[in-house]
Design a protein with these regions (language model features):
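C-terminal beta-sandwich/jelly-roll accessory domains of carbohydrate-active enzymes
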Residues: 212-270
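Active-site groove signature of glycoside hydrolases
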Residues: 8-40
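Flexible loop/turn segments at secondary-structure boundaries
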Residues: 31-36, 74-79, 123-127, 148-150, ...
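Generic beta-strand/beta-sheet core signal
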Residues: 25-30, 68-72, 209
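Glycan-recognition surfaces
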Residues: 1-7, 11, 18, 48-49, ...
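Catalytic cores of secreted or luminal carbohydrate-active enzymes
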Residues: 131-185
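Carbohydrate-binding surface patches
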Residues: 186-229
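Conserved, mostly hydrophobic/aromatic
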Residues: 28, 67, 140, 206, ...
Length: 270
């Protein structure tokens, strides 16, 4: 019976969380909804409501534990479960290249502070691509940042990268989690740009991602929305992946925009 199953799950989960030093639970479910109905009834709907009920019981018993909900197998990110969990895991595909578009799509519906965005291993388990720690760290910066790997298996340079980007995230976390998020439309479809501006509009953090070979020889102008039109802003490059530029064996298409080569003072007028 469903009531017996529910009580069994409550008992087992309570033992697990009560007898062990658990601070965080990722509630994962990697399967498709192949049988949403059963015997003429909305089984998936009933199961979801019981899942909410189970989280209610566990949340009351263990208020110190953070729950992270899963998105896989049918897109189970929803606003109702957000009243019971602290964040969502956007995708098991943790490839930083793929994550740029995944996280962009999620940003239309949910704010950065509830989006699990983790630095993964340099060789992604899902795509087998390999990315620098800079690219992975900056991709994970604009969310609920974490690490999705075993730090004991990597070299000192990787570990230093983890420390650097964790510190950078903590430095900007107040803005990232409480500012106003902006998605910037770029003329070149191979470029993604986004930013978050503080509530008082005194500072902002923007990320520009070049995801493929550009359609244009030189980068198009970058416009930063959401700023105070009457103010002047100092544009400073905080961090970037290693880039081979013109003069070091590069090509004209690798020429960096002026704001990457030196700080700029610009108007906040859109």
């Amino acid at each position: 019976r469903s009531s017996d199953l529910f009580e069994y799950l409550v008992e087992r989960m309570s033992w697990l969380l009560g007898e062990h030093a658990v601070d965080y639970v990722k509630w994962d479910m990697n399967r498709e909804l192949v049988q949403p109905g059963h015997k003429g009834k909305a089984a998936a709907d009933a199961q979801t409501r019981q899942f909410y009920r189970l989280l209610d019981v566990l949340g009351e018993r263990f208020p110190h534990i953070e729950f992270e909900s899963c998105s896989s197998g049918g897109g189970r990110i929803d606003y109702e479960v957000l009243t019971r969990c602290h964040r969502f895991w956007a995708s098991d595909n943790n490839d930083a290249l793929e994550r740029n578009t995944i996280q962009r799509g999620m940003s239309y519906f949910f704010p950065p502070e509830v989006m699990g965005a983790h630095i993964g291993h340099h060789k992604c388990h899902a795509t087998f691509r390999q990315h620098s720690i800079q690219f992975r760290g900056l991709t994970a910066l604009f969310g609920h940042m974490g690490l999705e790997l075993d730090p004991l298996t990597v070299d000192a340079q990787e570990r230093e990268g983890y420390r650097h980007y964790a510190a950078l995230h903590k430095r900007w976390r107040e803005v990232i989690h409480h500012g106003t998020q902006w998605r910037v439309d770029m003329p070149d479809t191979t470029t993604l740009a986004q930013g978050i501006v503080s509530e008082d509009k005194t500072q902002g953090l923007f990320l520009v991602s070049q995801l493929a070979m550009p359609d244009y020889t030189l980068m198009m102008p970058l416009r930063m929305p959401g700023l105070d039109a009457s103010a002047l802003y100092r544009i400073t490059l905080l961090d970037h992946p290693n880039i081979q530029i013109t003069g070091e064996g590069g090509h004209t298409m690798r020429k960096l925009p002026s704001w990457m080569e030196a700080p700029q003072t610009v108007s906040g007028e859109w």
